[in-house]
């Protein structure tokens, strides 16, 4: 499933680039994500937990920087994991491209998400709607954390919820589905 998402940050491109070059900080913006260990240069192990009502998916896997272009301000992250209960797997390639808008920056995300097993049974439309809500929450967290950095505050003290869960995601996804 291919998903494109763009947002604007009221920070200069070099500050936004420094943020995206910090994988643990970027991962902390994803609801339910937790990097547990750095296993090598630009390679990490971690977990992602997503729950909605009675459905709870817990993935364990790896995330790495696949490529980085400091001149063009493009970074590609690649992740893959398996459900801890053996009910499926997921992989993602996130391509983040930054474009200067004077004193602010446009962030263009291209996300290629593949889900198999139990999570895939809910149908492409529902998974796409849930994913869109999670991406919106991630983008909001990124903007909040970048603002905290610019203001000299601890970016880890603000931002994403600990887990991606339940009612708010389900309601937002339902709202998207009926539009």
Residue map of PLM features:
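A conserved amphipathic terminal alpha-helix motif
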Residues: 118-155
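Hydrophobic pocket/interface hotspot
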Residues: 16-20, 26, 65, 109, ...
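Short, highly charged C-terminal tails/helix-capping segments
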Residues: 140-179
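Glycine-rich portal/gate segments that line the openings of hydrophobic small-molecule binding cavities
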Residues: 38-80
């Amino acid at each position: 499933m291919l998903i494109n998402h763009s947002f604007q940050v009221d920070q200069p491109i070099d500050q936004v680039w420094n943020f995206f070059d910090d994988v643990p900080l970027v991962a902390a913006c994803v609801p339910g994500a937790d990097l547990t260990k750095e296993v090598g240069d630009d390679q990490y192990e971690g977990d992602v937990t997503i729950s909605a009502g009675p459905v709870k998916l817990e993935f364990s896997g790896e995330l790495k920087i696949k490529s980085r272009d400091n001149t063009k301000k493009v970074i590609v992250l690649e992740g893959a994991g398996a459900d801890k209960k053996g009910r499926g797997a997921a992989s993602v390639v996130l391509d983040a491209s930054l474009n200067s808008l004077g004193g602010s920056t446009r962030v263009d995300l291209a996300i290629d998400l593949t889900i198999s097993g139990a999570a895939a049974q809910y149908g492409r439309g529902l998974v796409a709607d849930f994913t869109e809500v999670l991406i919106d929450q991630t983008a909001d967290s990124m903007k909040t954390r970048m603002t905290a950095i610019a203001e000299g505050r601890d970016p880890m003290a603000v931002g994403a919820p600990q887990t991606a869960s339940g009612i708010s995601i389900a309601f937002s996804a339902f709202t998207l589905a009926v539009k």
